[in-house]
Amino acid sequence: LYIFSLFFIFSACQNNTQYSHDQLDSKFGVYISKLSNQEVSGHLSNGLIPIALKDNIDAIGFANTAGSIALKQNFPDKNAFLVQKLIDKGFFIRGKTNLSEWANFRSTSSTSGWSSLGGQTLNPYGLNRNPCGSSSGSAVAVALAMVEVAIGTETNGSISCPSSVNGIVGIKPTVGLVSRSGIIPIS
């Protein structure tokens, strides 16, 4: 099963108003790549809604790396089906979130939330706690209120686990409800 999810803000785990997005990203390892503050301001002034994507989903202007150095130059020529639908509805991509490299398909003993490109994503409730699951960067972005909505993927706990340990709600639509084109899959 390979399922998509929207992570909705449930409650921010910390009062982060004194920190910039860049400071939060630096501390918690949320993004692999992101728009500049100037680009974000332009989109916001046009009334668009920011969204974060797990870095295994195609989005024009961003490399789709699955967190791996091997795919660092993998720039798609079109958006994933899901991404295009979101853009058509008034969203813009704020950035690509860190993930467990290859969506945790490296080893049965690999570390959740670690990739060679993004380093280690940290759990905002406890820096020594597991951020849990390959969609951990997306979950942490929502938990820190860096975005209100983020997209993740799941084969085996990659949405449910980071949602539960980062204090947010993860929704998994029925398999087949949303096209999986433009996604680097593990199943």
What are these regions (language model features)?
Residues 13-75, 79-80, 98-104:
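Short, well-ordered alpha-helical
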Residues 80, 87-187:
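Short glycine/serine-rich loop segments
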Residues 1-6:
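Sec-dependent signal peptide recognition
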Residues 7, 25, 143-144:
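Alpha-helix termination/capping residues and helix-transition junctions
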